[in-house]
Amino acid sequence: VFCNTKKLAEEVALVLRNLGFNSLALHGDMEQKDRNKILVKFANKSLSILVATDVAARGLDIDSLDLVVNYHLSRDPEVHTHRIGRTGRAGNTGLACSLFHESEEYKIEILEKTLSQPIKRTLIDSVEKDFTPAQPDMTTLQIEGGKKQKIRPGDILGALTREDGIEAREVGKINISETSTFVAIKRHSLKKALEVLNNGKIKGKNFRARKI
């Protein structure tokens, strides 16, 4: 979900969380380490909805998104094109939609000229209130060790799938930074994965692991 201001990004993310959605905001006022954690969670599918400003989303490197929503229309047609280009990549299917008021019709007309194609308008009469938000299948663990400690993805997978551990299919994307490692784990295997990591060793050493 794209917003034009940091304040609105925070507010929209909060409203979505209050409705039961797994949602976080991403904007330039956040510390880099916090932005990195959120981007990792979104990329490894342990975060369902990312509400971001354009500047903050520049580091988003995902092959394709199922849905892109413009909560605000971008002031720049090129930025709009870049936003919606994040869905339906490489032959995948995806949906991009924009929320706008009738007073912004002229902006839609500008976008149609820029994109050289018509944009379908749909009037929203009401919003379905009787729903249960889906939760992501994955969750993310952070291990306090990374490249500096010469940790590799195979070391993490081996530690998690040892005899008393979890199955390899329960482990998702593994991201290793200089001093931390982020691992996507199936939500139902979270407790066991934490137990295995915190009571075991990686490369012969103890490393603390926690859910983020």
Predicted regions and their residues:
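Conserved helicase RecA-like core
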Residues: 1-212
